[in-house]
């Protein structure tokens, strides 16, 4: 089994017998569809401080060679609730994190460290998304709200 899938299993994903894994490319984006994986929710119902988020993310970001991690959304605006997810913008430039599987392992490791659901978008994906006229505002909002919670420099 590939190392990336082993990492999914390590973080609570369960392989269902006869599961299928589909992979395709669309507009130069590597798309992976996993049919038969489900992850049980074991989240912490609390509001983390920015410092706590930094402390939990740093070891994972360093392990993967991530350049920077930014917080946006309700946590960055100071509006987080106990059931809020954590929105992260990750700069993966200069890393080997190019496939959905490798990004998936990063996602799983960060989510495990935080013990809360996360939404993760890379800087390059944000740039691509912003090229669509209906999505320009999303990029502007993320860039305005973002708080640096990890910097490799």
Positions of predicted regions on the chain:
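A structural signal for short, well-ordered beta-strand segments
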Residues: 71, 86-88
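Catalytic core of pol beta-like nucleotidyltransferases
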Residues: 25-68, 77-78, 82, 93-153
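P-loop (Walker A) phosphate-binding loop of NTP-binding proteins
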Residues: 74
């Amino acid at each position: 089994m590939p190392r990336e899938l082993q990492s999914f299993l390590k973080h609570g994903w369960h392989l269902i017998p006869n599961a299928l894994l589909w992979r395709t490319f669309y507009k130069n984006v590597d798309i992976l569809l996993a049919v038969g994986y489900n992850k049980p929710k074991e989240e912490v119902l609390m509001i983390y401080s920015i410092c706590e988020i930094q402390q939990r993310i740093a070891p994972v970001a360093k392990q993967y060679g991530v350049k920077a991690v930014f917080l946006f959304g309700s946590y960055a605006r100071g509006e987080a609730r106990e059931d809020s997810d954590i929105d992260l913008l990750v700069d993966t430039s200069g890393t080997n994190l190019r496939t959905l599987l490798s990004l998936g392992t990063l996602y799983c490791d960060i989510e495990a460290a935080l013990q809360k659901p996360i939404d993760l978008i890379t800087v390059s994906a944000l740039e691509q998304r912003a090229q669509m006229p209906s999505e320009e505002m999303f990029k502007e909002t993320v860039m305005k709200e973002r708080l640096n919670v990890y910097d490799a420099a």
